[in-house]
Amino acid sequence: MMSQGVTVTVRLVRSFEHRNFRPVVYHGVNLDQKVQEFIMQINDDIPQRASLPQPFKKHSYDTLKVIHQPHGAKTNELVVGLEDDERLILAPDRTLRDAGVAHETELAFFCHKDYQIYKANPVSKW
C-alpha cells in the first residue's frame, strides 16, 4: 500500500550553542521510505534552496530527531530537546512511518557529533 505524501517541517540546526537554525518545509513526503533515504533527499535539496544562507548549505547534517508530534505538547527547548534520544532519534534503517513520523511532524536535522558535544555541556552562547 502506497502512503499519501505528508507535510514535514525539518529544522536545520547549524549551531546548538548559538541556537542557529532554519526551518524547511517538505510537502509530499512518503512515510514508507527509509529514514536514510529521506536524509539523502534532504541533503540533496539543501544546496538547491535559494532561501538558505551559504553556511546552512555547506554544513554537514546526518541525524534526524523528532522535535514535535502533531497534537502533542511542545518542549521549552528552543533548538532541540536533549532527552529521550533512544526514542526520538530516527534509526536510518526504519521507515519514517515506523519511526513515528506523521503529517505535520517537526524534525531536527543536525550533525550528530555537534549534538553530542552540546549535550555534554549544554551552554548557550547568546
From Swiss-Prot:
Q: What is this protein called?
A: UPF0538 protein C2orf76 homolog
The domain of life is: Eukaryota
One matching Pfam family: DUF2340
Instruction: Name the cystine pairs.
Output: none
Species for this entry: Xenopus laevis
Q: Which family does it belong to?
A: Belongs to the UPF0538 family.
